[in-house]
Amino acid sequence: MAKKTVEGEHGTPKTNFTKKETSKNHDDFKKIIGHKVVEEHYVEYEVELTSGKTITATEFDFKGDDSLLSTYKKKVTKQSDDSSGEYAVERVLAHRKVKGSPLYLVQWKGYPHPVWNSEMWEEDLDNCKDLLAAYKKHQEDLKIAQTPKKTPSKTPKKTPKSLKRRALTPSDDEEEAGPIAPEPKKTPKQSTKKLKRTTSPETNLVEKSKKKAIPDLENHTLDQEKNDVIERVEEIQEDEDDDDEQREEVVTTAPVETKSRWGFGSWKWF
């Protein structure tokens, strides 16, 4: 026999169920072959039709003529219905939408096996509104808990491209350069020369002009040295000519001494 809700916890059974059209015609059901539990609480039954065809049906599809289903439940659970027909809802397990309306799955007190669970419309649960309200609140809490919380995203500070690239990946020049060699130590003399070169205002002023005039100065220096050599050779030649002339003059102007063949010197008149 069908289970009925009770008014309150221990009341008189409510006998008037709200009948709604099911998705299948139970008049064609011949026998239940087996069942399986799906989604923890629901039970799907494998049913053979009078035509010999096999279909899958739920507890809701047997509404109006559940004698076939009741016999199967007793056989599986080895538990019979209460002959008085009084049953109390222990809790609401789940629900699904049928033609836009919620159809609730309930568990009965003293009948823990899933095959005893029944699907009922909300208007059939008037006597257990507290249980239905608790179930609805639990569903809302689950929905809120499963909704990801939106946290304000902080915009990261933009890093300049040059600095970012330098920090993440070294440039090609830095990779090829390798380790930097230590700077050679400078002697006091070199440091002094460098200081003088740096601090000399004249050097700083004409530094660029000197760099530009280096090729001309080199050519001019070579020509000057060549001319100096030629002039020096000419001076030496002139000096030698002057010495020759002086020697000739000495030879030509010197007095000629004549000797007598007799050995008495030059002729003298007394």
From Swiss-Prot:
Asked whether the UniProt record includes Coiled coil among its keywords, one would answer yes
Q: Which GO terms describe its molecular function?
A: methylated histone binding
List, alphabetically, the InterPro entries matched.
Cec-4, Chromo-like_dom_sf, Chromo/chromo_shadow_dom, Chromo_domain
Q: Name a GO CC annotation attached to this entry.
A: nuclear inner membrane
| Topology of the protein relative to the lipid bilayer | Peripheral membrane protein
Query: Per the record, what is the consequence of mutating Y87A?
Result: Abolishes binding to the tri-methylated 'Lys-9' residues on histone H3
Keyword Lipid metabolism in the entry? The reply is: no
Gene3D superfamilies hit by this protein: 2.40.50.40
> What CDD domains does its record include?
CD_CEC-4_like
Per UniProt, subcellular location reads as: Nucleus inner membrane; Membrane
Basic residues bias (residue ranges): 151-167, 187-197
Check the record and name the PROSITE patterns matching this protein.
CHROMO_2
One family from Pfam that matches here is Chromo
- Main subcellular location of this protein, as a coarse class: nucleus
- Which residue ranges have biased composition labelled Basic and acidic residues? 205-229
Q: Which residues form the Chromo domain?
A: 87-147
Question: What highest taxon heads this organism's lineage?
Answer: Eukaryota
Function description? Chromatin anchor protein which binds to methylated lysine residues on histone H3, thereby recruiting heterochromatin to the nuclear periphery, especially in embryonic cells, with a lesser role in differentiated cells. May be required for the correct positioning of chromatin and nucleoli in embryos.
Q: How does it assemble?
A: Interacts with mono-, di- and tri-methylated 'Lys-9' residues on histone H3. Weakly interacts with methylated 'Lys-37' residues on histone H3.
Q: What is this protein called?
A: Chromo domain-containing protein cec-4
- The organism is Caenorhabditis elegans
